Amino acid sequence: MIGEWNNGTGRRKSSVARVFLKKGSGKITVNGKDIQQYFGRETSIMIAKQPLALTNHVETFDIQINVHGGGESGQAGAARHGITRALIDYDATLKPALSQAGFVTRDAREVERKKVGLHSARRAKQFSKR
């Protein structure tokens, strides 16, 4: 579908990102702020831009990302997943390359719940033999 706006929803851990892209100069805004301001760490910015770098569309699209929930790492992963889906919505021929890189698959790893009688999900009380 080639229209004015292409969109995609990405998820990672407890973060959800709604991504909207259109032809432009390469400006990326996250929750109304520039991506450099929103994500403090350079690795988070790099993770979010990976699909664009892979498909050589870094300077091609203006992207608006609305993301909520989770922390910085989860939000960057959700943004990457959403950008991937929006790129596929824009041009379906990009899907094999993005799939080969592993960006299309949703990372299903979630935090394991804390169990009763344990300190955390798996950490038990120290065992004393005597």
From Swiss-Prot:
Domain of life the protein comes from: Bacteria
Question: In the record, which residues are listed under signal peptide?
Answer: none
UniProt keyword terms in alphabetical order:
Ribonucleoprotein, Ribosomal protein
* UniProt GO cellular component terms: cytosolic small ribosomal subunit
* Family from the record: Belongs to the universal ribosomal protein uS9 family.
The family database entries (Pfam families) matched by this protein are listed as: Ribosomal_S9 (PF00380)
- What lineage does UniProt assign to this protein's organism? Bacteria, Pseudomonadati, Pseudomonadota, Betaproteobacteria, Burkholderiales
GN (gene name): rpsI
Question: What organism is this sequence from?
Answer: Acidovorax ebreus (strain TPSY) (Diaphorobacter sp. (strain TPSY))
Q: Which GO terms describe its molecular function?
A: RNA binding; structural constituent of ribosome
Q: Name one GO biological process term.
A: translation
What PANTHER family does the record point to?
A: RIBOSOMAL PROTEIN S9, SMALL RIBOSOMAL SUBUNIT PROTEIN US9M
Q: Which Gene3D superfamilies does the protein's record reference?
A: 3.30.230.10
InterPro entries per record: Ribosomal_Su5_D2-typ_SF, Ribosomal_uS9, Ribosomal_uS9_bac/plastid, Ribosomal_uS9_CS, Ribsml_uS5_D2-typ_fold_subgr
Q: What is this protein called?
A: Small ribosomal subunit protein uS9
